Structures are given as C-alpha cells and as structure tokens.
Curated annotation (Swiss-Prot):
Changing residue 1051 to A: Abolishes E3 ubiquitin-protein ligase activity. No stimulation of in vitro CAND2 ubiquitination. The active site is at residue 1051. Pathway: Protein modification; protein ubiquitination. It is linked to Neurodevelopmental disorder with absent speech and movement and behavioral abnormalities: An autosomal recessive disorder characterized by global developmental delay apparent in infancy, severely impaired intellectual development, absent speech, and aggressive behavior. Keywords: Intellectual disability, Isopeptide bond, Proteasome, Transferase, Ubl conjugation, Ubl conjugation pathway. Highly expressed in skeletal muscle. Detected at much lower levels in kidney and pancreas. The gene is UBE3C. It comes from Homo sapiens (Human). The keyword Ubl conjugation applies. Interacts with 26S proteasomes. Interacts (via the HECT domain) with UBE2D1 and, less efficiently, with UBE2L3. This is Ubiquitin-protein ligase E3C. The lineage of its organism: Eukaryota, Metazoa, Chordata, Craniata, Vertebrata.
Length: 1083
C-alpha cells in the first residue's frame, strides 16, 4: 500500500535480533547427508565387530571342543586297546568313535586316527552296519557316507609316501559291497538303496578323481593289461573303477546312472591320458570279459558332452575311449544304440582338433593352412601324458578301421534307415573332409559310400526334399532358397550343407572312376558277361540334377556378395545361445565359420558341375543351351570396364579359391575404385562358372579385354615402340625362333613389323602395315606345328599334341621351343587371328586347367586303343595275373624300345585284381601327363606370356579350339557381302562383282571354305562375323586379261579378280585358282 504521510524516501529498518543464522538449502542437505553417513558407518563398524568377535569366540570354542573330543577319542581308543571299559567290538561304541572323529577331523592332524578307525570298522563291519537296522539308521548311514568321502580325500594324497593306501582302499571295497550289508540287514531292496546313496555320495566327493590319481601314482608306467594277474593292486583298482558303473547300471534308475557316468567321464576320461590309463585301464575296459556298460554309457555321454569336452578340452580323450572300447561292443549294440553311437561320433569328431598328419595331406589350396603349423608334434609325452595330436591321430586311425566302416555302412544300408541316420552320417563325413581334411580315397567310409549308387541317390533325394517354412506359412525347398540366393536360417543351413557337401564330394569322386561308356549307359560286354553300372543316375536325371547344381552355385555367389551388409539375425542369436555362444565376438566367429562352410560347399559343387560339363563337352547329353542361366545377364561392355591397365592383370582379382564378404577375392590397386556388388558377382561367375554366359558374349568379353590391353601396350599412334624383324621366307621358323626369343623380345604384345626376304635373299616388295605380319605369323605357326618339324604329333584323328620324343630330336633345349610356340599361338589370339591348327582335346584341357594334369577320361582323345584296353582290364573277371602285366610301359620312340617303370620297382610288381585300378590310372597318367609334362608346362608359360590364362579359362577345350581356328559353321554370304570392300574400279554394282556373287552363291559349302581360305588363309569365318575380319575382305580389279587366274594376297585379305563378265568362265577360273591355291606373289 502507498503512504500519503508526506515521506518521500524509505527509512532504513533496524533489527535488534542480531546477525541472521539462515542456512542455504544445499548446505543444509549436505550436512544432513554427512551426519547420516557417519551414523551408518558407525552402525556398520559395530555390526562387523560383533561378527568378528562372534567368529573368534566360535573358532575358540570349536577348537576347544575339537581338543576335548580328540582327547576323549584318544582315551576311548586307549581303553579299547588295553581291554578296558570301552570295548571296540560294540556297535554303539563304534558309532560314538565315528561321531567324535567326524566332528574334529583335520587331515593333517588326524590321518592316523582315521586309519586306526578304518582298521576297526573293517574288522567289526557287521557290528557297525547293524546300526542301519535300528533307530540310529540315518545317523549311521550319514557316518558311512562321510567316512567314504574321507577315504576319497585321503587317497587324493596318494603321492605321500608315509600314507598307507591299503586301508582306505579296503574301506572303500568293504562298505560299498552288498556282501557287507546283506547278512546283517536281510532286506535286499534296502541294501540296494543304502549302497546307491553311499556310492552317489562318494561320486560327488571326488571318487573317480581319487582313483585317477591313485592309478597314476601306484601303478608303474610300463604296466599293460596283460600284467593284471601279476600286479594285485591293479586288479583292485580296476574293480573299484567298474563297481559304481556296474551297480548303477544293474540296480539304479536312469537319473542315478547318469550321475555316475558323468563323474566317470569328467573326472576319469576327460583328463589327458597317462601311460597307466592308456595302456592298462582302457584296454581292460575294452575287454569283453569286463562287461563295460557301453550302450548306457553312450546314452549318458550325449547329455554330458558339452561340459566334459568344450570347457576342459577333453574331446580327444573321450573320443579315443569311445572308439577303443567300442571295438568289442559295436556288434552287440541295438539299432537305437547304433544311432546313439553315430550321434556320439558326430558330436566328438567336430570337437577333435586338426592333427598335423591330416593338415599336411591337404592340398595347397586349403583355406586353413596355418592350423597345421601350430599343431602339436605327433607323440611326445609331457609329464607322462600323451599329446593331444597323438590321440587325435589314433582316433582318426581307429575310425578308419574295417570294423568301424562296416558298422556304419550297415547302419546306412538298412532298409529301416531313417532320415536322421543319413543326416548324421553326412555330418560325420562332412567333418572328416572339411575339418580334418581327409580325402575320399584315403578313408574307407568315404570311399565305400562314393561307389554306392543307392546311397548317392538317397542322399540327393533328401537334399531335394528338404524344405523350410516361409513367413507366409508355405513350405519352400531349401534348394530353391539357395538358388535364389536368399539368406537361410542357421538351423536350415546346418541341415543341408553337410548333405550337399557330402553328395557333391562323393559323386565327384565316383565320376573319376566311371568311364564315358558307363556314364552314358552304353552296354559293356566283357568276356560274354554284361557288367553292372556304378552310375547312380540316368541321363535324364542328370540333366535335372546338373541344372539344380548350376543354380545352387549361382545362388551361393549371391549369398557371398550380398546387396547389403549381413547382420546377425534373431534366429542366429537364438541358435548360438543354444550352443553356449553369448558374446558378440563369439557370435562373429561363428558367423565367419558359417560363411566358410558356404565357401567350402561352393567349391565342391562347382567342381561337380565342371565335371558334368566336361562330360557334356566330350559327348553331349544335355539339350542345347542347357548350361546357360537366365539369372545371369553379363554383357561385355560392363565387364571390360573392370580392366586395370596399370596392373596388366585380367580381372583385378585372383582366381576364386575362396569367395565371401569376409575373405575378399579382390586384388585391386590403391588407385582402383572398389567394385560394386554386381561387378563382384559377374567376376565370380566368369571365373568359376563361365559356361552359364553365352559363348558369343564371352568371345566379346575376351576380345574387348584384349583390345583394352592392346591400347595400353600399342596405343593408336604409329610411332610407339614396336618390334622390327627381318625374316627369310625359306627359314621362317628358324629366324623367328632366334629373333623373337624372350631374350631378344621379352614383350610380344608390342606391334611387330616384318620385313621378308625371298628365296634369293632379296627384299620382297611392300611395307608391313599389318598384313605382312599376319601372313608371316600364319606361315610360322603352320611350320612350327607341322609334325614334320618334330615338336608335335597327331592322334589317329589328326589332332595335334606335344611329341614326347622332342627331347631326343633337339636336345635339352626342347622346352624353349615349346615356350616359343606357346608365345606365337598367344600372339595369334592376341591379334585376333584364326589359324587352322586342330589340337587334341586333352592338350587344350591341360593348357586351361589350374593343374597341368588331366584324368584318364581324356586318354580316348590321345590313344583310343590303349583306352579301350584299359577299360577291358578294369572289367576283366578272370585272373588278371594270367595277362602277364607289370607296372611298366614300353616306349617306341624313333625305333628305340625303352621300358619305363610306372612306380619304383614296377618291373617286379605284377598287375593283380587288387592293384589293377592303380595300374590303369598310372598308365593313363604316364601317357597323358608324365611323358609330356615339361612340354606342356613350357607351352603354357609361353602362352600366358602373351594372353593371360585367366581370360582363356572362360572357355572349355572345344571353345578354345573355336577361338583358335574358328567355328565349323556355314559361311554367310550376306554377312560377307556387307563387309566386303572393292578397289581398282570395282564397286558393289559393277557387272563383274554381280557375276562373282552369283557364282559364289552356287558354290557348295566346301567350295566356299576353299575360297575363304584362298583369300584369308583360313577356311572358317571370324567368330563374330566378317565385321571382325582385319584387314577387311577386299576384291581388287585384276585387269582385262582373260587368260589370267584370280590371285590373292592373304596378308591383306585381298582377292585380285580379272574382269570376267561371263559367269561360266569366272566360275571355272575361280574354282581352278582356289583348287590350285594360287596365292602369294602370283598376281
């Protein structure tokens, strides 16, 4: 309110209460919290002090009571020994002594007292056990259990020399025996219950751990099972090992049995084997007379494997035990028991570490070579324990025995075999091949399954029938999911990958031994008897199967290069957690392993597809365009953008031994941009499955890659560095071999200009603008590959292959000639020249393959007679030794017979029914590979010096022949007319030209080829039409002299045609000229 008393300023207020004591709110809260903290701290200190004081008082009182009871025990013991007022042969007195001892017992102080008590309990066991039948039965039972547990603890100190282990062992024997209880208690069921409780209490208190230590301490390391009767303690220890197993198996429910087997497994078997365990205990348990409960043990093992193998690394020891003991019990297993056995193999084989032996036998293309370097040495005992690597190798050997193989095969071949049997077997085989790198011919099981047509058919049926439920609720085959490249759940991939991998590996191996006649279902007659075929599929089935395999490969490529970065999906997290994987790093590792499985699957499927494609190439069984895929739309202009000039490397990536987003296959320079997903997929297809792309498109890709490389090396300008050589026409090969050698001209990609000298040593007219070089290269290749030159021979069909006797003709320099010829053929491909050189199919296959060797199926293209004889030998049913063969071959080179051994000491090794397959393959290998290995290697190196083999591997052997020599297709005159030039006054409308084309239209196809060869030196049209012919086909006015013949300059693809206006005359003159081959320098 306002004052209207006339005051114009505020008067100061005076407070008579002194200074203000108000606190800020924050300060007040802080002070309050601090006081509360101090009070809480004081209460905590007081409580702790009370606890400590209570503990100290309790400890002091207990120690005092221990001393009192210990003294009382000693007095009773003294009285009993002196025959005083405390007789020991009294049940209640024994109970009192036990109660006292259990109260104060300390092992370091009271061991002797315990031993004394054991001695009396054993002596008066019936009196003590009788307490189980009275009111103190629960107390007595508890005391027995505690005494047995003290036995176990005492025996764990068995290394103490002052300890007498005989009494504790006798105590275990007496109070775990039915014979101790039955005479006193009478009730058999109650006795069983008592012993069951005692044994389980012992088991939970380290019974088997005590036996493990006791065996290793008290038995000599040199002991073997045969020494059982000579070492009394060995027999007792073995009985103690078996007693809980036998008792629980015969008298206890499954839950109790499981506990005993768990302790036996974790404490006794999962630890590294000592010599005593390895040479005595395991052979003893494996003996059929021991009656080990093998089938219940297998059932229990499946439930406890995760604890006893993953965490402690006990898988090798357990697996060895299972295999060794199983040798005498497999025959007695029920069908359900065999299935459990198969599951055990599946479980422990996957946890078995990779042994150095299996790692070293794997080929160099393996993805995990580093594992073998870190593995242990085979067998070097450390502290008396066998090494893991030694046990691993022993496990793999035992798994490969005849008995094991027959057991597993019988399980699979039963009519009642379920899908689970096949899937579990596939998982076992998959682990053997992938993780342990075992090759099919080296493992009995794999080899036997590979040649069982019924198994392969059923395997493919299972693969085809596997399906998964989609989000929409519909069931979709897993093969279809793979073919689409759609992501698959962890569970589904775990189901199909082992089956698919096994099928592809086994079928691939069987195809190696199935010759073409058997593959195509031709009847085989040997000595009047028809042989059964090992082919599991008909040709019609193979067509569908090959299509599925092709699409699966393409789908896996899509999975390997996903459109988006893969994430850990929810079902993967659930699946990983079910097997104990929880951390993100563990999940990432599991994902990497999963993707590695897809990569490995891709390899084997691709190999099988290529083998089927190779069969179809040699002899068609698939319809036209069967191998082409509608999924892939790869165009030359897109792919060739990936060419990297600076690196001079084809695709910017190395050949796909591995694919996947985690293992990049790219080898891109720092300046190169990263490839898109589409580009990565295209490169993967062209590298691994090029035949799914049309041949014409691949030819375009090849030519555009050549053009890109040529632009870098040669350029468009005429003044860039090139190669200038002078060649004598009569010595074309000799001069070219000298002047175009690697030492003189290391880079044949450069433009070559040739100056020719005629037979008189005079210069031939003309400047080389490319035509003379092409003429020269054509003549050079004809000369070099002429069988008369000695470097190449011809098969019965007139096809070229390296002459094995070339070294005898030209000496040790023969490899240089093959290197030179390889470079020259590469130069022809590089310059897009067609040369009519018909090569043998096996030779082209050797050039294209990643390995220089080819298999027996190519022998038919080299020597059909030898191939036929080997097939006869393979199917021969009489005594093979009667044929008088040994492991040698005879060469008749240049009239000189030479005996060559196929293997060391081969002349002394007869060919028998057992080793004839090895003989057949060695003969084929010698003829196809060993004889000409150096020739082919040098030729391939020369070819790769000019044209990368990666480019050529886009084509099969037949396609490469077409690339070299052109296709056997009719000549299109319309195409030829469209790309023909005219000179010297001629034009398309000139009367002579019109007559010429009418005449040519009337030619047969053979006459048209002769005309083309007359003008261009090659009877086949260019692969992509006459627009690719360089220089272009040209008709030049040859003058008005009607007596002259048409002539040609093949170096310029030029036809010199006189002015023949009469159709009959032109026809006769032209036919005469092309038949007589009037050519170079005759115009």
């Amino acid at each position: 309110m306002f004052s209207f008393e006339g005051d114009f300023k505020t008067r100061p207020k005076v407070s008579l209460g002194g200074a203000s004591r108000k606190e800020e709110k924050a300060s007040l809260l802080h002070r309050t919290q601090e006081e509360r903290r101090k009070r809480e701290e004081e209460r905590r200190r007081l409580k702790n002090a009370i606890i400590i004081q209570s503990f100290i008082r309790g400890y002091r009182d207990r120690k005092q009571q221990y001393s009192i009871q210990r003294s009382a025990f000693d007095r009773c013991a003294t009285l009993s020994q002196s025959g005083g007022a405390f007789p020991i042969a009294n049940g209640p007195n024994l109970t009192l002594l036990v109660r006292q001892l259990l109260f104060f017992y300390k092992q370091n102080e009271d061991s002797k007292r315990l031993i004394w008590l054991y001695q009396n309990l054993i002596k008066h066991s019936s009196l003590f056990v009788k307490q189980l039948d009275g009111s103190e039965r629960l107390t007595c039972l508890f005391q027995i259990k505690r005494l047995m547990s003290l036995c176990c603890r005492l025996l764990q100190n068995c290394n103490d020399d002052s300890l007498n282990v005989a009494l504790p062992m006798r105590m275990l024997e007496v109070f775990s025996s039915e014979n101790t209880y039955l005479p006193v208690l009478q009730d058999a069921s109650y006795v069983v219950s008592v012993i069951e409780q005692i044994l389980h209490y012992m088991i939970h208190n380290g019974y088997y751990r005590s036996l493990y230590l006791l065996i290793n301490s008290k038995l000599p390391s040199s002991i073997e099972y045969s020494d059982l009767s000579r070492v009394p303690i060995a027999k007792i220890l073995l009985e103690n090992v078996l007693k809980p197993l036998h008792f629980t198996y015969n008298s206890c429910p499954e839950g109790a049995r499981q506990q005993v087997f768990t302790a036996f497994t974790e404490e006794f078997l999962a630890a590294p084997f000592t010599d005593q365990i390895f040479h005595f205990i395991i052979p003893a348990l494996a003996d059929a007379q021991t009656v080990f409960p093998y089938e219940p043990f297998l059932n229990a093992l499946l439930l406890i494997e995760s604890r006893c193998s993953r965490k402690s690394g006990g898988a090798p020891w357990l697996f060895y035990f299972v295999l060794t003991v199983g040798e005498n019990y497999l025959g007695a297993l029920s069908e359900e028991g065999l299935l459990v056995y198969l599951r055990v193999l599946q479980t422990f084989l996957s946890q078995l570490p990779v042994s150095p032996a299996s790692a070293s036998c794997h080929d160099s293309a393996s993805d995990s070579e580093e594992e073998s370097e870190e593995a242990d040495k085979p067998s070097s005992p450390e502290d008396g324990r066998l090494s893991v690597s030694y046990i691993t190798e022993e496990c793999l050997k035992k798994l490969d025995t005849k008995q094991q193989t027959n057991t597993l095969l019988n399980l699979v071949w039963r009519d009642s075999a379920s899908e689970e049997v096949f899937t579990t077997m596939a998982s076992v085989c998959h682990t053997l091949m992938v993780q342990h790198r075992m090759m099919v011919p080296k493992v009995r099981l794999l080899y036997s399954l590979a040649f069982n047509a019924r198994f392969l058919r059923h395997l493919w049926f299972l693969i085809s029938s596997m399906s998964t439920r989609m989000i929409t609720g519909s069931m979709v085959p897993l093969l279809q999911v793979i073919s689409r490249g759609s992501p698959m759940s962890f569970e589904d991939s775990s189901r199909i990958i082992p089956l698919f991998y096994l099928f592809s590996s086994l079928f691939s191996h069987s195809l190696i031994s199935i010759h073409d006649n058997e593959f195509f279902g031709d009847p085989i007659e040997v000595v009047g008897q028809r042989q059964s075929s090992m082919m599991p599929f008909t040709l019609e089935e193979l067509i569908m199967l090959s299509r599925c395999l092709r699409d699966a490969c393409l789908g896996i490529i899509k999975l390997a290069y996903p459109e988006t970065k893969p994430e850990v999906r929810e079902e993967y997290i659930t699946a990983f957690q079910s097997i104990g994987v929880t951390t993100s790093s563990e999940m990432q590792q599991c994902i990497q392993m999963e993707q590695k499985r897809w990569i490995q699957l891709f390899k084997v499927i691709t190999n099988l597809v290529k083998m089927l494609k190779s069969r179809d190439t040699r002899r068609n069984f698939c319809p036209p365009n069967h191998w082409l895929s509608e999924q892939e739309d790869i165009k030359a202009d897109k792919v060739t953008q990936l060419y990297v000039p600076a690196s001079r490397h084809v695709w910017r990536f190395r050949r796909m031994g591995r694919i996947g987003p985690l293992q990049s296959t790219l080898d891109v320079g720092l300046e190169s941009p990263p490839l898109s997903v589409s580009e990565e997929r295209q490169l993967a297809v062209l590298t691994e499955l090029p035949f799914v792309v049309p041949f014409e498109e691949r030819v375009k890709i090849f030519q555009r890659l050549i053009y890109a490389d040529k632009q870098e090396v040669q350029g468009d300008g005429p003044f860039l560095d090139g190669i200038n050589v002078t060649i004598r026409r009569n010595y074309i090969y000799e001069d070219a071999y000298d002047k175009l050698s690697p030492e003189n001209e290391p880079d044949l990609k450069k433009r070559i200009r040739v100056h020719l000298l005629n037979a008189h040593g005079l210069d031939e007219a003309g400047i080389d603008g490319g035509g003379i070089f092409r003429e020269f290269l054509n003549e050079l290749l004809k000369s070099g590959f002429n069988p008369n030159q000695g470097f190449f021979k011809t098969t019965n069909e007139g096809l070229l292959y390296p002459n094995p006797a070339a070294q005898m003709l030209v000496g040790d320099s023969f490899a240089r000639h093959y290197y030179f010829l390889g470079r020259m053929l590469g130069k022809a491909l590089y310059e897009n020249m067609l040369v009519e050189l018909p090569f043998a199919g096996f030779f082209l296959s050797k050039l294209l393959g990643t390995s220089a060797d080819v298999d027996i199926h190519h022998l038919a293209s080299l020597d059909p007679e030898v191939y036929k004889n080997l097939l006869f030998l393979k199917s021969y049913e009489d005594d093979v030794e009667e044929l008088g063969l040994n492991f040698t071959v005879v060469n008749n080179d240049l009239g000189e017979a030479q005996v060559v051994e196929l293997k060391f000491g081969g002349k002394d090794i007869p060919v028998t029914s057992a080793n004839r397959i090895a003989y057949i393959h060695l003969v084929a290998d010698y003829r196809l590979n060993r004889q000409i290995r150096q020739h082919c290697l040098a030729f391939r190196q020369g070819l790769a010096n000019v044209v990368s083999l990666e480019w050529l591997r886009m084509f099969d052997q037949q396609e490469i022949q077409v690339l070299i020599s052109g296709a056997q297709v009719p000549i299109s005159l319309e195409d030829l007319k469209s790309f023909t030039n005219y000179s010297g006054g001629y034009s398309a409308d000139h009367p002579v030209i019109k007559v010429f084309w009418r005449v040519v239209e009337g030619f047969t196809d053979e006459e048209k080829r002769k005309l083309l060869k007359f003008v261009t030196s090659c009877s086949r049209p260019p692969l992509l039409g006459f627009k690719e012919l360089y220089p272009a086909f040209c008709i030049h006015n040859g003058g008005s002299d009607l007596e002259r013949l048409p002539t040609a300059s093949t170096c310029m693809n030029l036809l010199k045609l006189p002015e023949f206006y009469d159709e009959t005359l032109l026809r006769s003159k032209l036919l005469y000229a092309i038949e007589c081959a009037a050519g170079f320098e005759l115009s």
